[in-house]
């Protein structure tokens, strides 16, 4: 394992902030009342029409553990699998699923390695800003193409990592507007 991969895994297993805090029951109930609302980057919601273009509802949340996006997909009727290398992030999804009576499959995996899924498994792959944490994106895109059904949707968020330093420098903290 590359040192930066281990560093990232350790960070996500130990950090506590808005990105690692699972949604509460009340937050999910509010989200349940409205059309699907998730973000690939901080503060920028994905248009609900994007999800309507999918041929099915089998979704892979790639590197988006934490008990946030996965539960939103589940309450909207998606067949949800979350793959993340952080065991603690996956445990948050499992905790919310159990608390809310949702079905969310969790898989501990590294997106820099082969994905543990059959070819053409998913209708949608949802990958929020996580690609900034890996050096080589080639495997991630090759594997996403392999496990995505023909005509499937690949949604990937990009953000310049400088934003995280800027937020820290200026003392601001993004709120839950990212999901």
Q: Which positions does each model-derived feature cover?
A:
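A short glycine-rich, Lys/Arg-flanked "PGG" loop and its adjoining helix->strand segment in the class I
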Residues: 138-153
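N-terminal, positively charged/glycine-rich alpha-helical extensions of SAM-dependent methyltransferases
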Residues: 1-29
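Class I SAM-dependent methyltransferase SAM/SAH-binding core
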Residues: 52, 57-114
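Conserved class I S-adenosyl-L-methionine
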Residues: 153-179
């Amino acid at each position: 394992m590359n040192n930066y991969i281990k560093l990232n895994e350790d960070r996500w297993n130990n950090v506590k902030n808005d990105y690692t805090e699972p949604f509460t029951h009340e937050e999910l109930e509010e989200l349940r009342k409205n059309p699907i609302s998730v973000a690939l980057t901080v503060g920028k919601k994905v248009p609900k029409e994007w999800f309507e273009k999918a041929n099915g509802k089998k979704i892979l949340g790639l590197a988006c553990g934490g008990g946030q996006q996965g539960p939103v997909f589940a309450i909207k009727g998606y067949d949800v699998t979350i793959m993340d290398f952080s065991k603690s992030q996956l445990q948050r999804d499992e905790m919310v699923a159990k608390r809310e009576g949702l079905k969310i499959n969790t898989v501990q995996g590294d997106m820099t390695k082969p994905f543990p899924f059959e070819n053409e498994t998913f209708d949608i792959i949802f990958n929020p800003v996580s690609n900034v944490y890996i050096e080589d994106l080639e495997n991630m895109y090759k594997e996403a193409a392999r496990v995505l059904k023909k005509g499937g949707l690949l949604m990937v968020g990009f953000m310049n990592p400088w934003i995280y330093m800027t937020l820290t420098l200026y003392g601001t903290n993004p709120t839950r507007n990212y999901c």
